[in-house]
Every structure is written in structure tokens, then in C-alpha cells.
């Protein structure tokens, strides 16, 4: 399974840049494999992202803004959903991945099942 993070390399918004960097740095630090898909430099990436963000996750006006996160072709969420999952030690579940043994998330899952 490949995590795909749709970003905009040439965004003029500092907020978007910070959010993108936050997601990418977290994935790198936790050795979670991912692909960056640049919507600013590649029209196909932009089109695919816009078409595959579910209706209920789209803004009321305009297009969904990066970063948008997918596991293969399955939509996982935007930055706000990622941030909430990280705060709740549930990023692996958010991404649709199995938490590694010994992680806080794996321990929390084990405690819930007990």
C-alpha cells in the first residue's frame, strides 16, 4: 500500500506550505512510505485529486486544497483529519495501515481490545 500526499510545490499560501511540510515530515520521521504528487506541476495529478476527493469532503466553494491524503486510491482525508488523528495517536488507522508493534497507537489498540 502506498500513501499518496497531494501537494502544491508552488503554493503562495504559507499556511498550505506549513501543513504540507507537517504531513511530509511526520511521515518521513515515522518511516512511513509515501509518494508526493505535485498538483502545481502536473495537471494529471491535479485532475485526479479533484475528482477523487469525496463530495462530502469538498469545500462548499472552490476546489479541495492540498495536502490531500490517499492510501492507493482510497481517500483518507485532508490536513485537519490528519492533525486530529495525530493528536489522538491514531495516524496509522487514519492512513489505513497497521501500527508497528511498540508504538503508542498499537498499545492503545491492544488496550481497547482487552
UniProtKB/Swiss-Prot annotation:
Protein localization: Cytoplasm, Cytosol; Cell membrane
Record InterPro entries: Glut_rich_SH3-bd, SH3BGR, Thioredoxin-like_sf
Signal peptide limits: none
A Pfam family it matches: SH3BGR
Region feature (Required for interaction with PFN1, HER2, and ATG12): 54-71
Region (Required for interaction with HER2) residue spans: 13-50
Motif (SH3-binding): 61-67
Keywords, sorted A to Z: Cell membrane, Cytoplasm, Membrane, SH3-binding
One of the record's GO molecular function terms: ubiquitin-like ligase-substrate adaptor activity
GO cellular component entries: cytosol; plasma membrane
Protein role: Appears to function as an adapter protein that bridges proteins together or proteins with mRNAs. May function as a ubiquitin ligase-substrate adapter. Additionally, associates with translating cytoplasmic ribosomes and may promote the expression of specific mRNAs.
Complexes and interactors: Monomer. Interacts with PFN1/Profilin-1. Interacts with ERBB2. Interacts with ATG12. Interacts with BECN1. Interacts with translating ribosomes.
Domain notes: The SH3-binding domain is buried in the tertiary structure, and it therefore unclear whether it directly mediates protein-binding.
UniProt name for this protein: Adapter Sh3bgrl
Organism in which the protein naturally occurs: Mus musculus (Mouse)
Amino acid at each position: 500500500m502506498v500513501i499518496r500526499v497531494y501537494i502544491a510545490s508552488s503554493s503562495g499560501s504559507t499556511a498550505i506550505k506549513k501543513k504540507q511540510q507537517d504531513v511530509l515530515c511526520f511521515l518521513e520521521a515515522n518511516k512511513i512510505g509515501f509518494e508526493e504528487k505535485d498538483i502545481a506541476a502536473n495537471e494529471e495529478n491535479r485532475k485526479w485529486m479533484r475528482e477523487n476527493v469525496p463530495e462530502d469532503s469538498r469545500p462548499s466553494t472552490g476546489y479541495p486544497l492540498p495536502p490531500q491524503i490517499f492510501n492507493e486510491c482510497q481517500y483518507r482525508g485532508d490536513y485537519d483529519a490528519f492533525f486530529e488523528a495525530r493528536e489522538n495517536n491514531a495516524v496509522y488507522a487514519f492512513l489505513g495501515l497497521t501500527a508497528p508493534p511498540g508504538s503508542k497507537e498499537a498499545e492503545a489498540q491492544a488496550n481497547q481490545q482487552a
